[in-house]
Amino acid sequence: VTTAPVFTITGITVPAGGNAMIIYEAMVNRYAPLDAGSSITNNANISGGGITPVTVDEIVRAQTAPLLTITKSISPVPVTENGTITYTFLIQNGGSADADAASGVTVSDNFDPVLTNLTATYNGTPLVPGTDYTYNETSGEFVTTAGRITVPAAVFTQDATTGIWAINPGVGTLVVTGTI
């Protein structure tokens, strides 16, 4: 959206040598561009009788960083004694930057009950114990190696007719399987 209804404030008197501060807050909506390098520009104008008009611009830039969320599911349900259990971690990146190896992302969990015969994959690729993750079969603590989990940035698309932006998050899937 390049224009919007004008927000007008009237009736403010500023004495000679004085000042006034006007503060307002606006929420970013679905028309705001979110991809890397995007910005929102706000223009303000002061005018009135006997003064020279003043114009000022303020630019707010879209954050360029990963924005990760994680959900965890378990299967099968119900879990059977001495059976195999699978934890699936769906990691989504709604941000405009990749969560790359330099980001140092780790996923950790304490499995209770403790799992034995543990295996793990990330996006279908087997993870190597001791290299890609650590697992303590006594405590149930599982931790991926920093930077092993990478999640691509979201893809932002704007509807040419409505101007509404859609966010398609980058996705990574960690699957941990073991015996209880």
Predicted regions and their residues:
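Exported/extracytosolic protein signature
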Residues: V1-I180
